Curated annotation (Swiss-Prot):
Single GO BP term: trehalose catabolic process
EC annotation from Swiss-Prot or TrEMBL: 3.2.1.28
Subunit-structure text: Monomer.
One Gene Ontology term of the molecular function aspect: alpha,alpha-trehalase activity
Keyword Cytoplasm: no
Superkingdom, taxonomy of origin: Bacteria
Protein's name according to its UniProt entry: Periplasmic trehalase
One GO CC annotation: periplasmic space
Record's catalysed reaction(s): alpha,alpha-trehalose + H2O = alpha-D-glucose + beta-D-glucose
Active site: D319 (proton donor/acceptor), E503 (proton donor/acceptor)
Coiled coil: none
Residue ranges with Low complexity bias: 554-570
Functional description taken from the UniProt entry: Provides the cells with the ability to utilize trehalose at high osmolarity by splitting it into glucose molecules that can subsequently be taken up by the phosphotransferase-mediated uptake system.
Gene: treA
Length: 570
């Protein structure tokens, strides 16, 4: 049951729709594919729909340095009344749009800057951050874009004032390391609640994120909780795991070879794989002006097509990267929806394997066998279609040109991470990553310098963890150590200088936060905190844990993966 505070009145939805009918015609390309309020009264609408032309005018006026500010603003009264006032006042002499916004909306508060106690080690600093980054939103203001959740949760930090899907798994690794299993359980419960409420886990708990998900790490979260609670966790969340899988596979039963539907594709040989997809094809409310400018820069493409590809890249977590573009220097050439990502399909393989394990734990052997069969079929499809034999690494498949892409990215490590790679191929991936992506400060996301944040020279904590654990899974301990040691050194040097952990790092050297992208570098930072704690355990023996990165590189990693390799690794 969805709490009443996140419902929208049918009458209000219809009133807004009728009141704005004439004005919204101007913005038809922005809202044409938004969900019809009358068709689903359970789904709250994002601010660009609730506020129509007012939202567009405020964002285009660039009243705030960050477009996310107004997307997160809370109307002080019924949006219908605010819109009526706006229509009456906007053409009057002396009308001040900023004053109108200040009177009618509560803007998000800037978070207080956290000043850590002097002399803290890296571990002490991270442990002290957990309560600082913890939020509770059981109740939210009416018309708020924030979606309530039943339990407390940890946010990434900075401008990210809400929970994010894939970020949270890496944050939870750190929470578990800090023995905050109660917080791990709370966050898994929140995601299970979202699956029950919306049919999927949205990008984040905002109304404007409901049209897409993110990399599907829920299975990993449940497996993590099962390390503490045993198979009871698997049995408890089996229904939500099944619903998550149904979301990603929706429409597969009607697909013919060569067809796609939302997040699922069927290749010409009948292989079934997945892609990222956003249900809307409008500018993102949190990046409204930027998306409109991107679409205008390429008049040869329909704006709605560009908007959906931008949104789908946000769903991938890699927003943005040359990985999704025809021209790495031109964002408007993005075509995320025509690319089958290797990392997404590795994660869905893991979801299928977890479903098999959870079904077996629940005593349903027949269903477990069915999920195992689906996982085996996906593994074969990954090996057949997402392996670049010429280059010697896993890569994405190009639906537009019906061929494997040549670009090497850190996503190539995901089949190793989920134990879905053949052993000889894993060795080739390790060699390629070491030769082309490994830098003094860690693993680069790609080797392309596009100015986008998911490209060189940036390295991101979750990709360092995926690489290190994936390489360990296949006995590539030397390369795993290099990734771990170099990234930790980068984190430590940056912390020594700035007394903070950041969202991303420049891995071309050590001690510098990353750049590029749509917003300034953010600190906090949830997934960096989690990965740092786990990596500290990798380089320090269990009998002598370290609170900071040692000055001397250890000879070998002290921990080994706990996951059982699949048949492909034997």
């Amino acid at each position: 049951m969805i709490p009443p505070e996140i419902r929208r009145s049918v009458l209000l939805q219809k009133a807004i729709k009728l009141a704005l009918a004439g004005t919204l015609l101007t913005f038809a390309s922005f809202s044409a594919t938004a969900a019809d309020p009358s068709s689903d009264t359970e789904t709250p609408q994002p601010p660009d729909i609730l506020l129509g032309p007012l939202f567009n005018d405020v964002q285009n006026a660039k009243l705030f340095p960050d477009q996310k500010t107004f997307a997160d603003a809370i109307p002080n009264s019924d949006p219908l009344m605010i819109l009526a006032d706006y229509r009456m006042q906007r053409n009057q002499s002396g009308f001040d749009l900023r004053h109108f916004v200040d009177v009618n909306f509560t803007l998000p508060k800037a978070g207080e800057k956290y000043v850590p106690p002097a002399g803290q080690s890296l571990r002490e600093h991270i442990d002290g951050l957990w309560p600082v980054l913890t939020r509770s939103t059981k109740n939210v203001e009416k018309w708020d874009s924030l979606l309530p959740l039943p339990e407390s949760y940890v946010v990434p930090g900075g401008r990210f004032r809400e929970i994010y899907y894939w970020d949270s798994y890496f944050t939870m690794l750190g929470l578990a390391e800090s023995e905050h299993w109660d917080k791990v359980a709370d966050m898994v419960a929140n995601f299970g609640y979202e699956i029950d409420a919306w049919g999927h886990i949205p990008n984040g708990n905002r109304t404007y994120y409901l049209s897409r998900s993110q990399p599907p790490f829920f299975a990993f979260m449940v497996e993590l909780l099962a390390q503490h609670e045993g198979d009871d966790a698997l049995k408890e969340y089996l229904p939500q795991l099944q619903k998550e899988y149904a979301y990603w596979m929706e429409g597969v039963e009607t697909l013919q070879p060569g067809q796609q539907n939302q997040r699922v594709v069927k290749l010409e040989d009948g292989s079934v794989l997945n892609r990222y997809w956003d249900d809307r094809d409008t500018p993102r409310p949190e990046s409204w002006v930027e998306d409109i400018a991107t679409a205008k820069s390429n008049p040869n493409r329909p704006a709605t097509e560009i908007y959906r590809d931008l949104r789908s890249a946000a769903a991938s977590g890699w927003d943005f990267s040359s990985r999704w573009m025809d021209n790495p220097q031109q964002l408007s050439t993005i075509r995320t929806t025509t690319i089958v990502p290797v990392d997404l399909n590795a994660l869905l393989y893991q979801l299928e394997k977890t479903l098999a394990r959870a079904s077996a734990a629940a005593g349903d052997r027949a269903e477990a066998s069915q999920y195992d069969a689906l996982a085996n079929a996906r593994q074969k499809a990954i090996e057949m279609h997402l392996w670049n034999n010429k280059e010697g690494w896993y890569a994405d498949y190009d639906l537009k040109n019906n061929k494997i892409r040549d670009q090497l990215t850190a996503a190539a490590l995901f089949p190793l991470y989920v134990n879905a790679a053949a052993k000889d191929r894993a060795a080739k991936v390790a060699a390629a990553a070491q030769a082309h992506l490994l830098q003094p400060g860690g693993l680069a996301t790609t080797s392309v310098k596009s100015g986008q944040q998911w490209d060189a020279p940036n390295g991101w904590a979750p990709l360092q963890w995926v690489a290190a654990e994936g390489l360990q899974n296949y006995g590539q301990d030397d390369v795993a150590m290099e990734v771990t040691w170099r990234f930790l050194t980068n984190v430590q040097h940056t912390y020594d200088r700035e007394k903070k952990l950041v969202e991303k790092y420049d891995v071309s050297s050590t001690g510098t936060g990353g750049g590029g992208g749509e917003y300034p570098l953010q600190d906090g930072f949830g997934w960096t905190n989690g990965v740092t704690l786990k990596m500290l355990d990798l380089i320090c023996p269990q009998e002598k844990p370290c609170d900071s990165v040692p000055s001397t590189r250890p000879a070998s990693l002290s921990a080994t993966p706990t996951k059982t390799p699949s048949a492909a690794t034997q």
